[in-house]
Amino acid sequence: MVNFGKKLMADQIPEWKGYYINYKLMKKKVKQYGQQVQQGEKDRRRVLKDFSKMLDDQIEKIVLFLLEQQGALASRIEKLGKQRAILAEQPDISAIAELREAYREVGLDLIKLLKFVDLNATGIRKILKKFDKRFGYRFTDYYVTSRSNHPYSQLQQVFKHVGVGAVVGALSRNLADLQERQGSYLSIYDQPSTALKDPIIDMINSSVDKLTRSTNFLRFLGQHALIVGEESPSTAEEEEIEDQKYHFMSLMLNLVNTFLYMVNTYIIVPTADDYSVSLGAASTVCGVVIGSMAVAQIFSSVYFSAWSNKSYFRPLIFSSIVLFLGNVCYAMAYDMKSLTVLIIGRLLCGMGSARAVNRRYISDCVPARIRMQASAGFVSASALGMACGPALAGLLQWKFKIYMVTFNQSTLPGWVMAVAWLLYLVWLWISFKEPNRATEVNGTQQNPASVQRADIEQLENGLAQPLLRDSSKKDEDDDEEVDDSEEGTHDSRKPATSIGSAYRLLTPSVKVQLLIYFMLKYAMEILLSESSVITNHYFNWNTSAVAIFLAILGLTVLPVNAVVGTYISNMFEDRQLLMVSQITLLVGIIFSFKITSTYSVVQYVVSALVTFVSAEVLEGVNLSLLSSVMSSRLSRGTYNGGLLSTEAGTLARVVADCTITAAGYLGIGKLLNVTLLPSLVICAASIASTFLTYNSLF
């Protein structure tokens, strides 16, 4: 494997040689410090102080050179601007062409500077990881916290790179102004939609986007999916391999599976209480009916995740068949007068949850250039299914019999979904294409592209990742000079092989993010699952009214994420949004309580909207942070970060639905406050936990 030390030497610009991070020296120092600590010559506090000072000096060297180069580029642009002003008064086509070439040369030099920043960023990240691995100490957390929060932070000055943005803006404007359009010179500020798309500007913007990991709506949506493996291939050969694996119709089938499953989950919510009553149970038993699907999903997520190591087609076939049978059982329970059959039907539906397969397919089989779009499609399909489920239930208000089979508002959701899954099964059988798989390595399947990516360190790898975070297997330092413990063993890079080993990889920051995810899913499930019971008790809403209310809640998901992903997340840090959205969620929960003798529709609807929207915002920010602070060993394999977050969310739904059923024994009048109390406590605990780990959330 190409080690980073050699890559740094090969890729650095010769005339800038003295300004790169001295990775070789830093690596030797880490080894030396390790030996000194083992021999008792230095204590750890002294080592931390010395190493911090050395790293500070290296970063300062990079910062000062970066600022110097930015100033030089700005000076060149200023001089070219004077020439442009002269040409504006006395146009000369040949002179304009020469001037545009001069601007392009500045652009090429800017790209060189971005590559300089990238190599150094990768070097800093790697040396921090090496130090952590050597000493078993989260030095990265300490260093990031102490340096990034300082008002004179050099880390912030480099990696926010405001100066680069100013240079890009100046280049874009000047190149656009040199483009003759109908005999005049137009400003990109006057007509941004018609601004010149010069290839050099596209190259610069691409580099800046990768380096900053800038947030936009598409990326914000994609982060909801917690789909890992977003590195770009470094060679045309790798891109060709990825393209060979990619099959558009197979991707669409995975997204449709996601959509149908979410419809299947929420289509029964408006009528579950009536169905329970018709079978002789209390209306609050709807909690068990709704939650039984989540109970089964806890187990199905694990075996589907493991199964996807070997195949995607067979798990999807199995999922469709089980979901078809589950919905038939759910619908037939009415005529069989059996609550047991009803719950078995929902359990079967939960056993057919293939969301782990859908995530894995996008991660492994979709080319990197469109993986974020596919991830956003996964989230959008989930949100659309969540809205369509209750809306569809509101439309299924007919009542008739065919022979001995009853079709009404309780059974029609089951029959409709059974037909939908049967049609999907036929489409899947005809159209799905199983991607080629390489030999199995260490219990996990590796495709040719991932094998090559593991062997080739690439420039884009650092650009695509934040500076100080754990990276994937290919980001590990497999230097040829191996000593006792400096170069991690193969085991230190293997994915987690069990829930227990995955849990041991969780840092306090990750645990807090999983707690927050549990909390928000719990609050949302309480709100949605008991909505039919609460609204019927207090407001006498019928099934159609409940369905419309739930559909409206579901339809807020994409607009809210559009606002947050496009605007708000670019103005504030993720951790700031995390704290604010939790506080807003807490406010929504508090206002949901029935404190006075009357409980109005306005209070319920407004508090529900605040709670639901806050939880949606929180989910996106939470998963974004979770992907940043999670160990690289949890980015692949069966027990990956996506599975852990799914398990946390599913467990929250199970607990919430059980809480509803248990609280029902105290009476419908007490149901609302009793079920909201755990939400209040867990939300307060998550806010306190966030406050304690706030400085490590990067």
Swiss-Prot record:
GO MF annotation: an example: transmembrane transporter activity
Membrane topology qualifier: Multi-pass membrane protein
Residue ranges crossing the lipid bilayer per the database entry: 248-268, 279-299, 316-336, 339-357, 376-396, 412-432, 514-534, 545-565, 577-597, 605-625, 671-691
Residue ranges, compositional bias (Acidic residues): 476-486
Cysteine disulfide links: none
Region (Disordered): 467-495
Family membership noted in the UniProt record: Belongs to the major facilitator superfamily.
The species this protein was found in: Oryza sativa subsp. japonica
Protein name: SPX domain-containing membrane protein Os06g0129400
UniProt cross-references to SUPFAM superfamilies, sorted A to Z: MFS general substrate transporter
Residue span, SPX domain: 2-145
KW Lyase (keyword) present: no
GO cellular component: a single term: membrane
Keywords assigned: Membrane, Transmembrane, Transmembrane helix
UniProt xrefs under PROSITE patterns: SPX (PS51382)
Subcellular location: Membrane
Superkingdom of source: Eukaryota
Gene3D superfamilies: MFS general substrate transporter like domains (1.20.1250.20)
